[in-house]
Amino acid sequence: MAVRSKSSKAWLHEHVNDHYVHMAQKDGYRARAAYKLLEINEKDKLIKPGTVLADLGSAPGSWSQVAAKLTGTSGAVFALDILPMEAIGGVSFIQGDFRENDVLAQFETLLDNRPLDLVICDMAPNMSGNAVSDQARSFYLCELALDFASQHLKTGGSFLVKVFQGAGYQEYMAAMREIFGTVQTRKPEASRNRSSEIYLLGKNKR
């Protein structure tokens, strides 16, 4: 039997005693991350009935669950991930790498010339334990998401992305400011205090 490290034991203890984990189980969300999006949306009103949005790196699907409830039948939610994701009512899921032409073609077919109001991205790489390489891989994913948003969002659209503060953060903020009229930071209560994660919100795409 594998011996758990002190850090994994601490994570397990925190997870078992996590208020948001219990709430997610009670409310039927697939992950506690749902409450991060709910809190941000409460403040910024990004998702409302009729919103058309793409959820990048969607698995296991808690952000797509929230989005589907908020957009209602008049909106549309497109979820994309390399990993499989169990079906969610009101969500069109494409399994594949959103950099690839065939995946983009599927997305554009489903979008059917509707303007894309919002791109949301809660992606993170599989962490190796090497802080330098993990940070670089994280921002690489963020850059891919920003490129997707810049290509597909309508003028005036919004982009919400998770980043980790550290090397590359200021440069990424600068890149977002070139594309969006305003860029703001959000740190929802459901984000663990010890985590360096923060959400960047770009509004009013140029």
Curated annotation (Swiss-Prot):
This protein's record includes keyword S-adenosyl-L-methionine: yes
Q: What is its main location?
A: cytoplasm
> What Gene Ontology molecular-function terms does this entry list?
rRNA (uridine-2'-O-)-methyltransferase activity
Q: Kindly list the GO CC terms recorded for this protein.
A: cytoplasm
Taxonomically, the superkingdom here is Bacteria
Q: Name one GO biological process term.
A: RNA methylation
Reaction catalyzed: uridine(2552) in 23S rRNA + S-adenosyl-L-methionine = 2'-O-methyluridine(2552) in 23S rRNA + S-adenosyl-L-homocysteine + H(+)
What the entry lists under Pfam families is as follows: FtsJ
Write out the coiled-coil annotation as residue ranges.
none
Keyword list, A-Z: Cytoplasm, Methyltransferase, rRNA processing, S-adenosyl-L-methionine, Transferase
In short, the EC number is 2.1.1.166
* Protein name in the entry: Ribosomal RNA large subunit methyltransferase E
The encoding gene is: rlmE
